[in-house]
Amino acid sequence: MAARLCCQLDSSRDVVLLRPFGSESGGPAVSRPSAGSASRADSPLPSAAESHLPLGRLPACFASPSGPCCLGFTCAEFGAMVSTMNFVTWHAKRQLGMPTKDLWTPYVRNQLLTKWEEGTIDSRLPLFVLGGCRHKYM
């Protein structure tokens, strides 16, 4: 089972907002490490924010302290949702040395990572978090 979450960068507070795709309400804020820091938080979702998260269509493991069982990231434009690109599959193949389309490297570097570090991610190019697991929806 999978749930789609839209991740939006709030550069004024230096946080990433997670919310179910199609929902108008803001989701819980997750702190973003600075560009020079490689450390990560233990939990992708602060426990204090769990009560404010609309849990419809999310897997049961999403609100657990250890996070969802499996996360996948895709990218898409709001105007062309049919053309999502699976970042996890591409990255896994690259790590194994398998041939991949070389279009991904400049796309990820120029469109996502550079803009993320600069805090200028275009609202038309969001990242979506796909939580896939064997748990039932809440």
Curated annotation (Swiss-Prot):
Residue ranges of region Mitochondrial targeting sequence? 68-113
* Alphabetized UniProt keyword annotations: Activation of host NF-kappa-B by virus, Activator, Apoptosis, Host cytoplasm, Host G2/M cell cycle arrest by virus, Host mitochondrion, Host nucleus, Host-virus interaction, Modulation of host cell cycle by virus, Transcription, Transcription regulation
- InterPro entries, alphabetically? Transactivation_prot_X
Question: What transmembrane ranges does the database entry give?
Answer: none
Query: What's any one GO cellular component for it?
Result: host cell mitochondrion
Q: Which GO terms describe its biological process?
A: DNA-templated transcription; symbiont-mediated activation of host NF-kappaB cascade; symbiont-mediated arrest of host cell cycle during G2/M transition; viral genome replication
One Pfam annotation, family name? X
Tell me what PTMs the record reports for this protein.
A fraction may be phosphorylated in insect cells and HepG2 cells, a human hepatoblastoma cell line. Phosphorylated in vitro by host protein kinase C or mitogen-activated protein kinase. N-acetylated in insect cells.
Where is this protein primarily located? Answer: host cell
Q: Where is this region: Disordered?
A: 24-48
Localisation: Host cytoplasm; Host nucleus; Host mitochondrion
Q: How does it assemble?
A: May form homodimer. May interact with host CEBPA, CFLAR, CREB1, DDB1, E4F1, HBXIP, HSPD1/HSP60, NFKBIA, POLR2E and SMAD4. Interacts with host SMC5-SMC6 complex and induces its degradation. Interacts with host TRPC4AP; leading to prevent ubiquitination of TRPC4AP. Interacts with host PLSCR1; this interaction promotes ubiquitination and degradation of HBx and impairs HBx-mediated cell proliferation.
Q: What does this protein do?
A: Multifunctional protein that plays a role in silencing host antiviral defenses and promoting viral transcription. Does not seem to be essential for HBV infection. May be directly involved in development of cirrhosis and liver cancer (hepatocellular carcinoma). Most of cytosolic activities involve modulation of cytosolic calcium. The effect on apoptosis is controversial depending on the cell types in which the studies have been conducted. May induce apoptosis by localizing in mitochondria and causing loss of mitochondrial membrane potential.
Query: What's this protein's family per the entry?
Result: Belongs to the orthohepadnavirus protein X family.
| Protein's UniProt name | Protein X
